[in-house]
């Protein structure tokens, strides 16, 4: 079967794309994980998502799940490892399985390098990746930023105004 759209990623961007495609009566397949988004699930409080404030990541994730369930959108747990342009369609590979789609949307989120010891364990409990999202949690506290690029410097300057 060839899908109109294959969406790789089940976080906020991927699910938003899926909802919009479904509304437009596109034949879609969404690849992701059963829990939708590990990073979202671990967020202690979200205040920068329009329409939702002072909501935990887990509660927001549950709202996402309710929304896609109400529209009949399912998340396929196959992990896509390769995508090939085949002319007028794309072949998406997962193990021995191949899926075809006319359009592919990559919504895999931000990928981080090798984790620092304790990083995964404390994600959402002191460790964060988004100054805009997490800065209010660190108001008037001492924070440390680990980063190796211009973006990390900008995040540090932003946090300096709040923490």
PLM ranges: what are they?
Residues 41-98:
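N-terminal Rossmann-like dinucleotide/flavin-binding domain of flavoprotein oxidoreductases
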Residues 34, 43, 149:
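Residues in the short beta-alpha loop(s) of Rossmann-like NAD(P)-binding domains
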Residues 2-3, 7-30, 112, 123, ...:
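Rossmann-like dinucleotide/flavin-binding elements
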Residues 1-6, 75-141:
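FAD-binding core/adjacent interface of flavoenzyme oxidoreductases
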Residues 34-36, 54, 111, 132-133:
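Short, acidic/turn-prone active-site loops that include or flank metal/cofactor-
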Residues 14-16, 37-40:
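Short N-terminal binding/cap micro-motifs at the start of the first secondary-structure element
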